[in-house]
Amino acid sequence: MDNTRTAGAPPTRRRPLTLALGSGALAALLVTTALATGAGAGEPSGPGPGTQAVPRHAVTGYWHNFDNGSVIQRLADVPDDFDIIAVSFADSTTVPGEIEFNLDPVLGYTSEQQFKDEIAAKQAAGTSVIISVGGELGNVTVNDPASAQAFTTSTLALMDEYGFDGVDIDLEHGINATYLTQAMEGIHAATGDSLVYTMAPQTIDMQSTSSQYFQLALNTKDFLTVVNTQYYNSGTMLGCDGQVYAAGSVDFLTALACIQLESGLDPSQVGLGVPASPNAAGSGYVSPQTVTDALDCLTQGTNCGTFVPDRTYPDLRGAMTWSTNWDAHSGYAWSSVVGPHVHALP
């Protein structure tokens, strides 16, 4: 996902409030215990900020904390068709595994509190707002116990400070499934099942269960909300039938999603990630109608291309787009079609 910024004032940098969860000693003990023993180490601390459940069929959209020439969009202006908004992106620090968030002044907020109030308003309307980590330019390294703990602690701190409902993993420069699993287990142990936890791997990352991303998804499937694979900016890939498919078609979406659906993930944990407009990705754009056809094919066995799944998956979670800003740039041509269709799935 392209988070290249246009020239302008840099966002104000601020260290994450790593002890914002309460007593510093208590927060450190919680994280250390969770990382050492996993999510079952103790009782969760209770519901997170949003507490509302993600709908059975949901639409995820990435929101730009930067200006890349699409549309500068306030969080409040994201359409209600989106059930999960992934704020893009958190920033890395000099501490391995640690993240922080720096609101870009180009967005025009008069204060950070105004931004936080818009998060709360979205949540009050039933939308989950999460912090996304990674993107094309973002690189957060979690590859040992110390960096795993730093990721857990700093993510929980951002959730506490801004009210985020959870976290999205969009790391595109390689991950270590072992230690990122530990980090996510620590976050889940602290927040409980109110956590909204999404992933946006690239197509190559979900071709085989032996890949690090697929392993992370399977390791954390007990609390994973949805994997929205990016079915764009991709070369040809194998489908679950062993045939080769090219991006930009209904078959690419359905045949590749079938791999996840038949390899251990629950259908409710699988979503279709696509660009909102031709400008939003270098390649792989499909029309909103193609997205709805793919959804119908996988959930009901209708409107398929040449690939027809052996069975249907009525609980398929839905669709994702990069991004709400590019959607706005195209007059909401994507969300106005895909959103109602997802929400009307049986």
Region locations from a protein language model:
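Secretory targeting and sorting signals
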Residues: 1-42
